[in-house]
């Protein structure tokens, strides 16, 4: 049985922390506190987890959160590759709950998705998860029920490898990045449905217009503003939910709490970064230190030395750093630059380094969205296909939605993009990318030409060859679609409640091509099976469980349907998933 670790009795809020100290509103997990060795947590093969309500204070305001074993995040679980683990999850909420083991390969009935894997865990009920651990690395776990993940039901997961890893380190720290809102998540959703840019406090001003006229001229500025107005979109709307309501947390602690990880000078330190947020992409750097990226989504990659990395929602990255004596700031700013999570690596308790300012606010361009050079004056905002002259009659978007192009990989250069018939005159689709590319070498909006070496997907190369080796027998193309004004999200313009399952035959190897027709980024996660990302020429690059899809991108990956059952396939932006960007993948004999 695992040993319970001691917990801090209180976490101070952003404001009025000195006044509130001693109230005992909640407990911070011991693994999230500074310690001289490996992080504490629950380890072994048998675990007891309880999901319930806990009073917390993160921002200076007392709120009721949903927690696992009383903490945010939940306990760090440590498994060992090759073991069989048993996890007894008890529900002390007044609603059904669940736990999904993100990125873990396991039987379908252990995956933890109500309605697909099982019925969920009823109030006062318990579910016993039991499965063999077939992998190693950095992962996480979270509720797959409603908005419970946003309310605090998540935690980190580390699986120790049974064989020596291809790098060394003397110490490790888990760094879990999340977003917290004092608001009820249902209220957040209600606001987004009424006004999709409700939380965008970075809208352009008259002053911005005057500055742009000075730089670009009157004609170019007014034309650009007119195009955005025609699309009923805003180039500053990079995140549906922003720092206007979110506080960004590092290991459950707000920026002013300064989570601290200790080290001895000259040690090699492994940092296990986990983005367990509901809606936030983070750009992570440690001023004064290079990071050697050694793993992505739990699996080893060929080492890449960078200054900064963007971590999509649900992704994980492992890096090695080697700090000298002193203090270093762990700085994770939100992609829209409305806030940051922050911590410190230090050789002595109490030390801290300067916190850098937020980078300038980035703006989306037409090129970002695959719309460069297009005439928006004739744009039909009922989403009439951008290429009306093409014959789409042969597209099959029913039992296997998507265009089937055999084994054709993505093209290296931008291509004129066709679209499925289901997007035609669709009230749930307000935009279509017209010229798409893989964008594997692109650091992403807000990170280009910033003077720092930024990790890109092109840098990610697994330390192993394609584990399957077969060419895909067919290609499934799916479009990520949405309507910004209505805050509606879908695949191919078809929301989950109206969509048929994607049917895969057990054992087949397929290529999935994703096209992002929206102005938002989408991290796409397939449960139960690995996603083997390809380069522009269809060659295997890296094995992942979550694929980041920037606006206007077209990316492909291979999937081996080696897991029977019903599996979730969805955008991991929680509010996008809840609003329809979700499919069932069914693997049958």
Swiss-Prot record:
Q: Where in the cell is it found?
A: Periplasm
* Positions of Cu cation 3 binding: 144, 527, 570
- Signal peptide residues are 1-32
Q: Binding positions for Cu cation 1? A: 100, 525
Q: Which residues bind Cu cation 2?
A: 102, 142, 572
- What cellular component terms from Gene Ontology apply here? periplasmic space
Q: Which UniProt keywords apply?
A: Copper, Metal-binding, Oxidoreductase, Periplasm, Repeat, Signal
Asked if the Swiss-Prot or TrEMBL record annotates the protein with the keyword Metal-binding, the reply is yes
**Residue pairs linked by disulfide bridges in the UniProt entry:** none
Q: Spell out the residue ranges making up region: 2 X 8 AA tandem repeats of D-H-X-X-M-X-G-M.
A: 367-403
Main localization of the protein? periplasm
Q: Which InterPro entries does the protein's record reference?
A: Cu-oxidase-like_N (IPR011707), Cu-oxidase_2nd (IPR001117), Cu-oxidase_C (IPR011706), Cu-oxidase_fam (IPR045087), Cu-R_CopA (IPR006376), Cu_oxidase_CS (IPR033138), Cu_oxidase_Cu_BS (IPR002355), Cupredoxin (IPR008972)
One Pfam family linked to the record: Cu-oxidase_2
Where, by residue number, does Cu cation 4 bind?
522, 571, 576, 581
sequence repeats mapped onto the chain: 367-374, 396-403
Keyword field contains Electron transport: no
Molecular function (GO) terms for this protein are: copper ion binding; oxidoreductase activity
Q: Which Gene3D superfamilies match?
A: Cupredoxins - blue copper proteins
| Processing and modification events after translation | Predicted to be exported by the Tat system. The position of the signal peptide cleavage has not been experimentally proven.
Give the function comment from the record.
Could be involved in copper resistance. May have oxidase activity.
The UniProt similarity line reads: Belongs to the multicopper oxidase family. CopA subfamily.
Under the heading PANTHER family, the entry gives: FI03373P-RELATED (PTHR11709:SF394), MULTI-COPPER OXIDASE (PTHR11709)
The record ties this protein, via NCBIfam families, to: copper_res_A (TIGR01480), TAT_signal_seq (TIGR01409)
What name is this protein filed under?
A: Copper resistance protein A homolog
Phylogenetic lineage: Bacteria, Pseudomonadati, Pseudomonadota, Gammaproteobacteria, Pseudomonadales
User: Gene encoding this chain?
Assistant: copA
């Amino acid at each position: 049985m695992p040993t319970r670790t001691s917990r801090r009795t209180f976490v101070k809020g952003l404001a009025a922390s000195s006044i509130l100290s001693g109230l005992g509103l909640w407990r911070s997990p011991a693994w999230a506190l500074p310690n001289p060795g490996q992080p504490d947590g629950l380890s072994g093969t048998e675990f007891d987890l309880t999901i319930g309500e806990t009073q917390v204070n993160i921002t200076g305001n007392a709120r009721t959160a949903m927690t696992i074993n009383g903490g945010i995040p939940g306990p760090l679980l440590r498994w060992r590759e090759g073991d069989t683990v048993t996890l007894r999850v008890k529900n002390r909420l007044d609603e059904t709950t669940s736990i999904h083991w993100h990125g873990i390969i396991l039987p379908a009935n252990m995956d933890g998705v109500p309605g697909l894997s099982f019925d969920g865990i009823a109030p006062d009920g318990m579910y016993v998860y039991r499965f063999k651990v077939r992998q190693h690395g950095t992962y996480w776990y979270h509720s797959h029920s409603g908005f419970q993940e946003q309310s605090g039901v998540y935690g980190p997961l580390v699986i120790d490898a049974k064989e020596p890893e291809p790098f060394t380190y003397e110490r490790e720290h888990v760094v879990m990045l999340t977003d917290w809102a004092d608001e009820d998540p249902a209220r957040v959703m209600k606001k987004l449905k009424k006004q999709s840019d409700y939380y965008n406090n970075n809208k352009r001003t008259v002053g911005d217009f005057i500055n742009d006229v000075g730089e670009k001229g009157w004609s170019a500025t007014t034309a650009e503003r007119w195009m955005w107005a025609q699309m009923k979109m805003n180039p500053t709307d990079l995140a549906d939910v922003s720092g206007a309501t979110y506080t960004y947390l590092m290991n459950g602690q707000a920026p002013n709490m300064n989570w601290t990880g200790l080290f001895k000078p000259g040690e090699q330190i492994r940092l296990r970064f986990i983005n367990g947020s509901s809606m936030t992409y983070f750009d992570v750097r440690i001023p004064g230190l290079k990071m050697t990226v050694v793993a992505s989504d739990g699996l080893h990659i060929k080492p890449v030395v960078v200054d900064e990395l963007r971590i999509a929602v649900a992704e994980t990255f492992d890096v090695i750093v080697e700090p000298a004596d002193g203090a270093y700031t762990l700085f994770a700013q939100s992609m829209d630059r409305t806030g940051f999570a922050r911590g410190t690596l230090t050789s002595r308790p109490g030390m801290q380094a300067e916190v850098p300012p937020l980078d300038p606010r980035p703006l989306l361009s037409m090129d970002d969205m695959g719309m460069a050079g297009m005439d928006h004056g004739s744009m039909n905002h009922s989403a009439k296909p951008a290429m009306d002259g093409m014959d789409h009659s042969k597209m099959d978007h029913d039992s296997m939605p998507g265009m089937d192009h055999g084994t054709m990989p993505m093209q290296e250069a931008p291509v004129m993009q066709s679209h499925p018939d289901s997007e035609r005159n669709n009230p749930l689709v307000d935009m279509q990318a017209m010229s798409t590319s893989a964008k594997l070498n692109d650091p992403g909006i807000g990170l280009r030409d910033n003077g720092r070496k930024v990790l890109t997907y092109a840098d990610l190369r697994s330390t192993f060859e394609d584990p399957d080796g077969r060419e895909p027998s067919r290609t499934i193309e799916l479009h990520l679609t949405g309507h910004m004004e209505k805050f509606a999200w879908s695949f191919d313009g078809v929301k989950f409640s109206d969509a048929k399952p994607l049917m895969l035959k057990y054992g087949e190897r397929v290529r999935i091509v994703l096209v992002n027709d929206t102005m938002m980024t989408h991290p796409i996660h397939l449960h139960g099976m690995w996603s083997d990302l390809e380069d522009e020429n269809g060659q295997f690059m890296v094995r992942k469980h979550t694929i980041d899809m920037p606006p206007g991108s077209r990316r492909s990956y291979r999937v081996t349907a080696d897991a029977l059952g019903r599996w979730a396939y969805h955008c991991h932006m929680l509010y996008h998933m809840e609003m329809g960007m979700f499919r069932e993948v069914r693997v049958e004999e």
